[in-house]
């Protein structure tokens, strides 16, 4: 797993694992560079300001090749082209992260986002699994994420990653639609509580 508290750090490219402070007074915001992610950032930053917490923007990228999962004999056949493919994926992830980071900074400067302390984490793996693993390791107070990812179909009410996180998370999860008409939780005038009376 590659994990970094700074998206654009050379430590990520070099494969090092920077230390991350364990402070559970955080709002976790999983991002995937879609419009849903930016809306989730807006809500997450405002919520973090309201509860005097920090925000953590987490992106999980997936590489199709894991040398450690290959049969022992096949590890020696691991081709340079595969390593180059992984590096290309990392470069693309960094470019996307840089673009999102610039958007967040612009919105902070313009006053659209509150000027709070935030950090960025990059992990390799399956998104829902790494989000839940991060929650287990660092115990943030709440998760704020988009209802759908950028690759979801228009008719999907909620994406598979978000649905899995909601189902399995032991901390509260706010799923934010991209077209929600307000910017803060404090602007909500009515709350609908939907339940099947399951004990969870």
Where are these predicted regions, by residue range?
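Short, conserved glycine- and acidic-residue-centered signature motifs
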Residues: 37, 93, 158-162
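Small/aliphatic-rich secondary-structure junction motif
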Residues: 19-83, 109, 188-200
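General small-molecule cofactor/ligand-binding pocket signal
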Residues: 56-58, 119-123, 174
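A short acidic, glycine-rich active-site loop
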Residues: 78-96
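Glycine-rich, charge-decorated loop segments at or immediately adjacent to ligand/cofactor-binding or catalytic sites
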Residues: 183-187
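Gly/Ser-rich helix-loop-strand patches that form or flank binding pockets
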Residues: 1-16, 129-181
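Structural beta-alpha unit
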Residues: 7-18, 22, 62-65, 91, ...
């Amino acid at each position: 797993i590659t994990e970094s508290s700074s998206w654009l750090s050379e430590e990520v490219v070099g494969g090092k694992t920077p230390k991350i402070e364990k402070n559970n007074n955080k709002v976790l915001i999983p991002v995937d560079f879609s419009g849903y992610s930016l809306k989730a950032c807006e809500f997450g930053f405002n919520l973090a300001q309201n509860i005097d917490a920090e925000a953590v923007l987490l992106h999980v990228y997936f590489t199709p090749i894991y040398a450690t999962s290959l049969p022992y004999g096949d590890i020696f056949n691991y081709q340079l082209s595969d390593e180059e493919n992984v590096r290309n994926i990392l470069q693309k992830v960094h470019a996307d992260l840089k673009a999102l980071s610039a958007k967040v900074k612009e919105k902070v400067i313009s006053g659209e986002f509150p000027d709070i302390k935030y950090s960025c984490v990059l992990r390799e793996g399956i998104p829902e699994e790494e989000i839940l693993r991060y929650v287990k390791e660092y115990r943030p107070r709440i998760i704020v994420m988009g209802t759908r990812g950028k690759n979801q179909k228009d008719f999907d009410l909620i994406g598979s990653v978000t649905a899995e996180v909601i189902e399995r998370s032991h901390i509260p999860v706010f799923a934010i639609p991209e077209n929600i008409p307000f910017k803060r939780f404090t602007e909500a005038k009515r709350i609908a509580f939907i339940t099947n009376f399951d004990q969870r």
